[in-house]
Curated annotation (Swiss-Prot):
<keyword id="KW-0489">Methyltransferase</keyword>
<comment type="similarity">
    <text>Belongs to the methyltransferase superfamily. RNA methyltransferase RsmG family.</text>
</comment>
<dbReference type="InterPro" id="IPR029063">
    <property type="entry name" value="SAM-dependent_MTases_sf"/>
</dbReference>
<feature type="binding site">
    <location>
        <position position="75"/>
    </location>
    <ligand>
        <name>S-adenosyl-L-methionine</name>
    </ligand>
</feature>
<keyword id="KW-0808">Transferase</keyword>
<keyword id="KW-0949">S-adenosyl-L-methionine</keyword>
<dbReference type="GO" id="GO:0005829">
    <property type="term" value="C:cytosol"/>
</dbReference>
<protein>
    <recommendedName>
        <fullName>Ribosomal RNA small subunit methyltransferase G</fullName>
        <ecNumber>2.1.1.170</ecNumber>
    </recommendedName>
</protein>
<dbReference type="Pfam" id="PF02527">
    <property type="entry name" value="GidB"/>
</dbReference>
<comment type="function">
    <text>Specifically methylates the N7 position of guanine in position 527 of 16S rRNA.</text>
</comment>
<feature type="binding site">
    <location>
        <position position="80"/>
    </location>
    <ligand>
        <name>S-adenosyl-L-methionine</name>
    </ligand>
</feature>
<dbReference type="InterPro" id="IPR003682">
    <property type="entry name" value="rRNA_ssu_MeTfrase_G"/>
</dbReference>
<keyword id="KW-0698">rRNA processing</keyword>
<feature type="binding site">
    <location>
        <position position="141"/>
    </location>
    <ligand>
        <name>S-adenosyl-L-methionine</name>
    </ligand>
</feature>
<keyword id="KW-0963">Cytoplasm</keyword>
<dbReference type="GO" id="GO:0070043">
    <property type="term" value="F:rRNA (guanine-N7-)-methyltransferase activity"/>
</dbReference>
Amino acid sequence: MNPATQLADGIATLGLSITESNQARLLQYLALIQKWNRVHNLTAVREPEAMLALHVLDSLAVLPHIGGSRIADVGSGAGLPGIPVALARPEWRVVLVESNHKKAAFLQQARIELGLENVEVIGERMEGVRSNAGFNTVISRAFSDLADFVKLAGHLCARGEEQGTDCGRLVAMKGVYPHEELAQLPETFIVDNILSLTIPGLRAKRHLVVLKRAGQ
């Protein structure tokens, strides 16, 4: 199956609507990762078909479960899930936070080449980033531990009064159900939802853990 067909079929299976032009930009993004990967080792996945499923479709699968006008992707790495999210939802403002200089340089180049006017790249450690308004969604697939995610990125979540009606959410992209991590969750954040996701082309388990501030 060629990449364009694989992508279109995957998007349809996920029940998403993404314009043809933005599907083409998603494929352009994939090609850009492959190009940079030869030198900078952005991802251990090398095979294009696997990369499309493991990175692009895996990122797009979160779309029905996140929202708000301001999204932060912390520990963004190669721009996952932030760049696919930004391409699929150009009306959202997406901030990519990545402290590794080579990866941050890739993100800046991708932003320019893909014409991502709704994307900002911050080349700093996430715990040092400050946002006056806070973010509706702070998402990451970089963390192996939920407690670390809360500790380092929790301050970026908008508080209820800043949102008008609701507080922001921390959203962690996980593999198997994280029983042990949930048991160690700090008291400052509680579970809002845990969703099991099916990714087209992947057999591996995927879960989305949604956290909110305790008391909000």
